[in-house]
């Protein structure tokens, strides 16, 4: 949840949206022409159920009585320190194909709330991630978010994550931020994030295989403010062929630095072309996600 000392140029916006009751974020998945077949995985959770059999819950994660995915422990309405939880979709995603060399495009949208009793002592954050199917909670939690053992880069992790970081650790930039993480909690790219305590955040993350571009957008409907971050990421060189996707979150490692981490809804779609193909510019599929 940090960035290197040489910080690259970022695409960043902080602008009002004209839509009051809904946000519709649309993007194009550029698919290959003359496609014979494709592997498509798609699911949607408008809310969550206590007996949600298609989710794998790790650590302190649970589904609350409100139908929300509660990633870290809350007791009597108060978040607890040193809590880590993760939730992953049960079915692995075929993210690239070794026999063809092709890589999947994907998009995921979700809404979440992070609420701290004391805003100045928020910790530590929440992340969406892709990891090997058997990946379990890693490290001490806290600023590593249950993803990594340390802040150093290690290719053996085989993890890509987008973190929403509410606490400034030693490896972080000097601000709350959204970061793109590749095999390290020390993000390859970040954008300053004006976290709004207790407010619903709507997120869209998309990956364009044709351009190897990972794009993140976060919007607060209450203030009509948005944040955008984009980076070049070669999934095939980082991830195994099959991954699981999901969320992870952690509270601080001392008693005062705590917050809640609740996912309200989640949708995901991936498309991996498996048939013969020709040019790249004719077959364009449109996917649109709307938050109401």
Swiss-Prot record:
Gene3D superfamilies: 2.60.120.200
Pfam families: Lectin_legB
Keyword Zinc set for record: no
Residue positions binding Ca(2+): 165, 167, 169, 172
GO MF terms, alphabetically ordered: D-mannose binding; metal ion binding
Keyword ATP-binding in record: no
Keyword terms, alphabetized: Calcium, Glycoprotein, Lectin, Manganese, Mannose-binding, Metal-binding, Signal
Span of the signal peptide: 1-37
Residues that, per the record, bind Mn(2+): 163, 165, 172, 177
Residues bearing attached sugar chains per UniProt: 82, 154, 186
Reported function: Mannose/glucose-specific lectin.
UniProt record similarity statement: Belongs to the leguminous lectin family.
Protein name per the record: Seed lectin
């Amino acid at each position: 949840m940090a960035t290197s000392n040489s910080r690259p140029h970022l695409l960043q916006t902080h602008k009002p949206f004209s839509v009051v009751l809904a946000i519709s974020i649309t993007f194009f998945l550029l698919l290959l022409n003359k496609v014979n077949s494709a592997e498509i995985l798609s699911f949607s959770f408008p809310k969550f159920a206590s007996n949600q059999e298609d989710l794998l819950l790790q650590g302190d994660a649970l589904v609350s009585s409100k139908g929300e995915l509660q990633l870290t422990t809350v007791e009597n309405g108060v978040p607890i320190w040193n809590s880590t939880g993760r939730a992953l979709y049960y079915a692995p995603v075929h993210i690239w194909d070794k026999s063809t060399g092709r890589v999947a495009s994907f998009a995921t949208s979700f809404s979440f709330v992070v609420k701290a009793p004391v805003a100045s002592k928020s910790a530590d954050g929440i992340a969406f991630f892709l990891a090997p199917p058997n990946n379990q909670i890693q490290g001490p939690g806290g600023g590593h978010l249950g993803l990594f053992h340390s802040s150093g880069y290690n290719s053996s992790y085989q993890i890509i994550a987008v973190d929403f970081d509410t606490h400034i650790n030693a490896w972080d930039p000097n601000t709350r931020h959204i970061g793109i993480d590749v095999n390290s909690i020390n993000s390859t790219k970040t954008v300053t994030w004006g976290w709004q305590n207790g407010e619903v955040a709507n997120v869209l993350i998309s990956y364009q295989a044709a351009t190897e571009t990972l794009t993140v957008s976060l919007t607060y409907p209450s203030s009509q403010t948005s944040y955008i971050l984009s980076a070049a990421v070669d999934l095939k060189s980082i991830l195994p062929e099959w991954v699981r996707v999901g969320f992870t979150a952690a509270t601080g490692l001392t008693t005062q630095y705590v917050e809640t981490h609740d996912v309200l809804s989640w949708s995901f779609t991936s498309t991996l072309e498996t048939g013969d193909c020709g040019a790249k510019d004719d077959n364009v599929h449109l996917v649109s996600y709307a938050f109401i």
